[in-house]
Amino acid sequence: MELFGTDGVRGKAGKLLSAQLSMRLAMAAGIYFRKNSRTNKIVVGKDTRRSGYMIENALVSGLTAVGYNVIQVGPMPTPAIAFLTEDLRCDAGIMISASHNPYYDNGIKFFNHQGDKLQPEDEKAIEAIFFDEQTIEENQKTDQDIGSSKRIDDVIGRYIVHLKNSFPKDLTLNGLRVVIDTANGAAYKVAPTVFSELGAEVFVINDEPNGFNINEKCGAMYPGELAKKVREYRADIGFALDGDADRLVVVDEKGKIVPGDLVIGALATYLKQEGMLQADAIVATVMSNKALEDYLATLGIELVRSNVGDKYVLDEMKKRGINFGGESSGHIIFGDYSKTGDGIVTALQITAYMLRSQKGASEILYPFSLYPSKMENVTVKEKKPLETIEEFPELQKRIEKSGIRSLIRYSGTENKLRILLEGKDQKKLEKLMEELIQFFKERLS
């Protein structure tokens, strides 16, 4: 059994993610982190789900049982926990969140002492300890070796200062009207405070979490309400965060939702203009539109592609000395300020670009047009390696020659083959998609 998925351990709270599993996972992680412990402290944060209380208490029990001292900071964005892990000199950080998922799901994400998400080898080592009864028993502490726990409520101030430090010192948001949808999630206090303190007139929606309404028809997954409110309040821009605030969706002053690849392109333009872009390159995933790549090339910026997931984006950034990257889904990483996607940092950089350029959101956020794209799923009986399917290599060569970009891969969670096609000719795309669906149905369904 594998515990870790693409972003930590995630599942339905009380079922897959039970109190028992959470406590044992905390013990296993604590045993692993203590091997290279420097301070014997771990910080734990959460979003606003009701199940967060259960999981938090289970994690604290598990960590203190193996001798760790725990700092509990309550509801905080995921990027805040990444920041605080390093800022508070902790051995590790743990965030309890299922990000954009519904309230009944929850998850546990780990950060190392530098605030980075764990590498696969770290996760495998924790899993091995989790399933090793003897190691768990041998590391259970007694007497004065049992750890302690304390709750600190004022660390939110440290994160707010950090966010404001990411905004240019010579600018203020005075006169700017901003609507923020906090998705009834972890940033319901932080996001409005930061924008207000920088001088903006802030209108906040979905900022009354009750444990069950996180991401409920609101936030980054449902930006429709934000679009209406931007028009209603005649705001200059709108920002929708998800439940743990590592993702951002942007709405311009006309109430139009801006595609993520355009946001990435606009921010790359800004960083290049300001001389802040390192290595003349950015990282995006295999899902980003080819038009982004072609546009960046006109600016002398290389687009490096990574696998899907912000931790893979960050890995590629580190490898190549790049300080900016993101996913079209809204996870955007400014390497100078954050080790993970940070929706609030991204929102601040967009407003800085507006102020620097003295232009409205709609004037800066559409630097190019996306190429037509089409995505379809084919249900499959088995996930045969694609390269072993007869005639597939020849078909791939033909697609490449046609000038159409294709991404064909199996879903990680379902018995489905996902087909993404992109190109300048919509009719050509549709014809090829029909051919591919038929091809794979005959061979895999």
UniProtKB/Swiss-Prot annotation:
UniProt keyword terms in alphabetical order: Isomerase, Magnesium, Metal-binding, Phosphoprotein
Cofactor: Mg(2+)
SUPFAM superfamilies: Phosphoglucomutase, C-terminal domain, Phosphoglucomutase, first 3 domains
Alphabetical GO biological process terms: carbohydrate metabolic process; peptidoglycan biosynthetic process; UDP-N-acetylglucosamine biosynthetic process
GO terms, molecular function: magnesium ion binding; phosphoglucosamine mutase activity; phosphomannomutase activity
Pfam families documented for this protein: PGM_PMM_I, PGM_PMM_II, PGM_PMM_III, PGM_PMM_IV
Post-translational events: Activated by phosphorylation.
EC number(s) stated in the UniProt entry for this protein: 5.4.2.10
Catalysed reactions listed for this entry: alpha-D-glucosamine 1-phosphate = D-glucosamine 6-phosphate
Function: Catalyzes the conversion of glucosamine-6-phosphate to glucosamine-1-phosphate.
PANTHER family reported for this sequence: PHOSPHOGLUCOMUTASE (ALPHA-D-GLUCOSE-1,6-BISPHOSPHATE-DEPENDENT), PHOSPHOHEXOSE MUTASE
Protein name according to UniProt: Phosphoglucosamine mutase
Naturally occurring in which organism (per UniProt): Nitratiruptor sp. (strain SB155-2)
